[in-house]
From Swiss-Prot:
Family: Belongs to the DHPS family.
PROSITE patterns with a match to the protein in the record: DHPS_1, DHPS_2, PTERIN_BINDING
GO cellular component, one term: cytoplasm
Pathway: Cofactor biosynthesis; tetrahydrofolate biosynthesis; 7,8-dihydrofolate from 2-amino-4-hydroxy-6-hydroxymethyl-7,8-dihydropteridine diphosphate and 4-aminobenzoate: step 1/2
Role noted for this protein: Catalyzes the condensation of para-aminobenzoate (pABA) with 6-hydroxymethyl-7,8-dihydropterin diphosphate (DHPt-PP) to form 7,8-dihydropteroate (H2Pte), the immediate precursor of folate derivatives.
NCBIfam families: DHPS (TIGR01496), PRK11613.1 (NF008625)
One Pfam family per UniProt: Pterin_bind
Sequence ranges assigned to domain Pterin-binding in this UniProt record: 15-267
Keyword Ligase set for record: no
Organism: Escherichia coli (strain K12)
Top EC class for this record: transferase
Any single biological process term in GO: response to xenobiotic stimulus
Name of protein: Dihydropteroate synthase
Binding site for (7,8-dihydropterin-6-yl)methyl diphosphate: T62, D96, N115, D185, K221, R255, V256, H257
C-alpha cells in the first residue's frame, strides 16, 4: 500500500510515525510552544531526526471546548511553517485543517496530506480537497470540538464509525476524490468516552476491510489520562502502549507528540510482525 503526493510516494508496508507540530497558542498538550516560525522549524527538525516520516502541522486547536480560529489567522499560522518545512526537509507534510482556503494554500506550498477532523464537511472543503488531488484523512467525530465530550452516546460505537466511513468514502468518490487517496482515522477522543475509545482500539484491525491506510492519534489523550489518573505530561507510557496495540493490529500511521520513543517502540513492533510473518522465532 502506498500514498502518492507532490511527485513522491509513501510506502505503508511498515508503520510510520507522524510528529505533531501545533502552531497554536491553546492546544491541550503543547499549545504555545512552537508559535514562532523558527521554533516550529526547529521542532520539526528534531522530530525528523528522531525518525518522524510525516509532520502534521495544525493551526487550530481541536481540544474539547476549543475556540474557532479565523481563516486569516489560520493561514498566517500554518502556511509559512508548511512552506519552510517543505523547502528544508525531505519529509511528508500533513496539514490538520478543515478550511478550504488553508487546504488550497497548503497544497500550493508543498503539503502532502489533508488531515481534516471534520472530514471535509465545511462549506467548500470537499471541492478544495478534490482540486488539490492530495490524499485526505477522514476522521470520525460525534458533534464538534466545542461540545463533543459533553455526553457521547452510541448504540454500537464500532458499527457507527464503520457506517460513517462508508458514507464519507462514497461522498468523496462522488466529488472526484479517488478511494485510493483516502485514509481513515476512528477519531479517538473525539466525541467518545473511555469505553468507546477502548472498544475502537480493541477492534481497530476490523477496519482493514476498507483496504485503506489507518491513521490513529491517541498520544497524551484523556483516554490515557483518565485511565491512569495522570496529566498530559505524564502520559508517555500509556501513549506508547496505545501506539503498540494499534501498530500490532496493522495501523499504518501513528500520530504522536513523543517521536523518538514511539519510533523505538515501532521498531520492536516491526521486528515482532516480521518474525510472525516469517515464522522465525530464533
Amino acid at each position: 500500500m502506498k500514498l502518492f503526493a507532490q511527485g513522491t510516494s509513501l510506502d505503508l508496508s511498515h508503520p510510520h510515525v507522524m510528529g505533531i507540530l501545533n502552531v497554536t497558542p491553546d492546544s491541550f498538550s503543547d499549545g504555545g510552544t512552537h508559535n514562532s516560525l523558527i521554533d516550529a522549524v526547529k521542532h520539526a527538525n528534531l522530530m525528523i531526526n528522531a525518525g518522524a516520516t510525516i509532520i502534521d502541522v495544525g493551526g487550530e486547536s481541536t481540544r474539547p471546548g476549543a475556540a474557532e480560529v479565523s481563516v486569516e489567522e489560520e493561514l498566517q499560522r500554518v502556511i509559512p511553517v508548511v512552506e519552510a518545512i517543505a523547502q528544508r526537509f525531505e519529509v511528508w507534510i500533513s496539514v490538520d485543517t478543515s478550511k478550504p482556503e488553508v487546504i488550497r494554500e497548503s497544497a500550493k506550498v508543498g503539503a502532502h496530506i489533508i488531515n481534516d477532523i471534520r472530514s471535509l464537511s465545511e462549506p467548500g472543503a470537499l471541492e478544495a480537497a478534490a482540486e488539490t488531488g492530495l490524499p485526505v484523512c477522514l476522521m470520525h467525530m460525534q458533534g464538534n470540538p466545542k461540545t463533543m465530550q459533553e455526553a457521547p452516546k452510541y448504540d454500537d460505537v464500532f458499527a457507527e464509525v464503520n457506517r460513517y466511513f462508508i458514507e464519507q468514502i462514497a461522498r468523496c468518490e462522488q466529488a472526484g476524490i479517488a478511494k485510493e487517496k483516502l485514509l481513515l482515522d476512528p477519531g479517538f477522543g473525539f466525541g467518545k468516552n473511555l469505553s468507546h475509545n477502548y472498544s475502537l482500539l480493541a477492534r481497530l484491525a476490523e477496519f482493514h476491510h476498507f483496504n485503506l491506510p489507518l491513521l490513529v492519534g491517541m498520544s497524551r489523550k484523556s483516554m490515557i489520562g483518565q485511565l491512569l489518573n495522570v496529566g498530559p505530561s505524564e502520559r508517555l507510557s500509556g501513549s506508547l502502549a496505545c501506539a503498540v496495540i494499534a501498530a500490532m493490529q496493522g495501523a499504518h500511521i501513528i500520530r504522536v507528540h513523543d517521536v523518538k520513543e514511539t519510533v523505538e517502540a515501532m521498531r520492536v513492533v516491526e521486528a515482532t510482525l516480521s518474525a510472525k510473518e516469517n515464522k522465525r522465532y530464533e
